A protein has these predicted regions:
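A cross-taxonomic marker for long C-terminal extensions/tails that follow the last structured domain
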Residues: 121-144, 148
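Acyl-donor binding region in acyl/amide transferases
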Residues: 47-106
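Short glycine-aromatic motifs
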Residues: 2-4, 30-31, 93-98, 120-122
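A conserved beta-strand-loop-helix scaffold within acyl/acetyltransferase catalytic domains
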Residues: 18-49, 124
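Short, ordered beta-strand-loop transition motifs
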Residues: 27-28, 45-52, 102-106, 126-133
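Secondary-structure transition/turn motif
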Residues: 55-60, 113-117, 138-145
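Conserved catalytic-core motifs of GNAT/GCN5-like acyltransferases
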Residues: 97-114, 119-129
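Short amphipathic alpha-helix that is part of the acyltransferase structural core
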Residues: 1-23, 132, 137, 148
Length: 149
């Protein structure tokens, strides 16, 4: 996790992102970049009643909290993001509890609850070239959930 003493310019954060991921930085159409020198940056867009988080670089917990506050202020029902890490350590990192696991053709879907009892769903998105599975993450902002298509 980044600390507040690691201030960087936006270009320095982009360079850090590119070195860490091996990906070239780009911001998709419709996404807005939020940046703070000592926190990094996040790319966020609204899609209907969901706030989508595309890239986060820097203090991930800060940007998650920022996105949750922003989504709530905008009247969104859920946060949507992508998990490129192993799902179970990712779930533990956020303090979520797995309530149910589904296995379909060797791909797992994880139904979780956060510390406030709200639903979180990790669903397989695609398989990377190295064989790792990338997941869609839907975190509902109220107890219960709405259906998002």
């Amino acid at each position: 996790m980044m600390t507040r003493s690691k201030a960087k310019t936006f270009d320095e954060w982009v360079e850090y992102y590119e070195q860490k991921t091996g990906d070239k930085y780009k911001c998709p159409n419709g996404y807005r970049v939020y940046y703070l020198p000592d926190r990094g940056f996040a790319q966020i867009a609204r899609s209907g009643e969901m706030l989508l988080i595309y890239i986060v670089c820097g203090d991930g917990k800060f940007w998650h909290d920022f996105a949750e506050v922003l989504a709530t202020a905008m009247g969104c029902d859920a946060l949507g993001s992508i998990c490129t890490r192993a799902p179970l350590p990712y779930i533990r990192f956020w303090g979520w509890k797995v309530e149910k696991t589904e296995n379909k053709d060797g791909f797992f879907r994880f139904w979780c609850k956060d510390k406030q009892g709200r639903k979180v769903l990790l669903s397989p998105k695609h398989v990377e070239e190295n064989g790792d599975v990338t997941y869609w993450v839907t975190q509902y902002l109220r107890k219960g959930e709405k259906k998002h298509g």
